[in-house]
């Protein structure tokens, strides 16, 4: 789906169409969710609407038993896994939260249903030598503007831990004059500051010299060859092309740089609260998952270095 907004089909009920629009606006404007997240929530809602039409249920009169029936239907027809169930339930809870706020329903029927918590996967990150290999790689066209941009983009991703949607929406006027600090708008429209190291600043400075001459009026920092802002899909494509040129089997994704950023900070002794702030996590528990990665590295060092551990 990439950056392309999901389009709801036109339903027979006009109130249904208006309700869907209110929900999408809430996700987009108030929650500041990425387009990919909005697409996923939209598809979840589409499934639910279709189920309600099929069963002749009124969206505004739904009971908890109807929500249970819906998930039983999904499990039987689509065989969705636990992770998908949890997200679809989250979508419905958010949807009815909006309806409740608009006084369109009396209660939220989705709050009375729960699934066992999905175990969070340990994030995958690059090893230090892998990160260096990606950053130091130079293609045959290293002097081209697009290559200079790509190098700056990768340095920024690793130096700051930005989410990909934060990267593509980053504005030039939110960047400090010395290029070391950037103000970003993250999830839930939460503002935070991220910081760039020497390598990122140097690469960014080189890229901006070209970018500002070619497209001085553009708002976003990272642009395509037509002067339009890069899309999240475009960033993923660029990284995948770099992977191919390097001859790598491993994937290179924006989120992997974010994971590596967090893990490397914790490995170096950074306070977890500071890492939480830099990543823009609202909950410390989200950041704590990186500790398990860091602990595994410590165990590995111990096993290799301690005389008795090697026996």
From Swiss-Prot:
It comes from the Bacteria. SUPFAM superfamilies: DNA breaking-rejoining enzymes. Keywords: Cell cycle, Cell division, Chromosome partition, Cytoplasm, DNA integration, DNA recombination, DNA-binding. Disulfide bonds: none annotated. Pfam families: Phage_int_SAM_1, Phage_integrase. CDD domains: INT_XerDC_C. It is found in: Cytoplasm. Residues 14-100 form the Core-binding (CB) domain. GO terms for cellular component: cytoplasm. Its main location: cytoplasm. GO terms for molecular function: DNA binding; site-specific recombinase activity; tyrosine-based site-specific recombinase activity. GO terms for biological process: cell division; chromosome segregation; DNA recombination; DNA transposition. Residues 121-303 form the Tyr recombinase domain. The active site is at 163, 187, 255, 258, 281, 290 (o-(3'-phospho-dna)-tyrosine intermediate). Forms a cyclic heterotetrameric complex composed of two molecules of XerC and two molecules of XerD. Belongs to the 'phage' integrase family. XerC subfamily. Site-specific tyrosine recombinase, which acts by catalyzing the cutting and rejoining of the recombining DNA molecules. The XerC-XerD complex is essential to convert dimers of the bacterial chromosome into monomers to permit their segregation at cell division. It also contributes to the segregational stability of plasmids. This is Tyrosine recombinase XerC. It comes from Leptospira interrogans serogroup Icterohaemorrhagiae serovar Lai (strain 56601). The lineage of its organism: Bacteria, Pseudomonadati, Spirochaetota, Spirochaetia, Leptospirales. The gene is xerC.
